[in-house]
Amino acid sequence: MKLTSKGRYAVMALVDLARFDNINPVSLRDISLRQGISLNYLEQIFSKLRKKEIVQSVRGTQGGYVLNKKAREIKLNNIFDAVDEKVKTVQCNKESKKGCNGKSTKCLTHNLWDELENHINNFFEKKSLEDLVKDNIERRI
């Protein structure tokens, strides 16, 4: 399974945003400094998040970004979908008639990896930004 930096950084940046969302809009520069993520990379990520209406931008000197929904309503799978991140544990195309690796049947461990992928996706469908913010606060105490 491969989760790219784009997906990890999108989640990290949104958790940061969710922590400060009730105060004022948060600038990408502030997120960049706090999380050690390139500002240019954050701009690319937030462009996708804005298009999928996960965040909205606020213009002006006190501008920045705010969540478009409550943190509890934004699930990790929504974030991954917004930045075109797919969790894939099987190498084959599940819909292929050829099976795994171009053969006529599935590979011996196909069902294992397919089941793992389902568990991961179910986890991401249930876990919200609010959960991650609360978890972060509890671990710091």
Predicted regions and their residues:
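Short amphipathic alpha-helical interface segments
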Residues: 10-22
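The C-terminal cap of the DNA-recognition helix in HTH/winged-HTH DNA-binding domains
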Residues: 19-22, 33, 51
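A short alpha-helical element within helix-turn-helix/winged-helix DNA-binding domains
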Residues: 26-35
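Key DNA-contact positions within bacterial/archaeal DNA-binding proteins
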Residues: 40
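Basic amphipathic alpha-helical segments that dock to polyanions
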Residues: 45-50
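Beta-hairpin "wing" of winged helix-turn-helix
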Residues: 54-62, 66-67
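Conserved segment of winged-helix/HTH DNA-binding domains
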Residues: 71-96, 109, 115
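C-terminal regulatory/oligomerization modules of transcriptional regulators
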Residues: 94-141
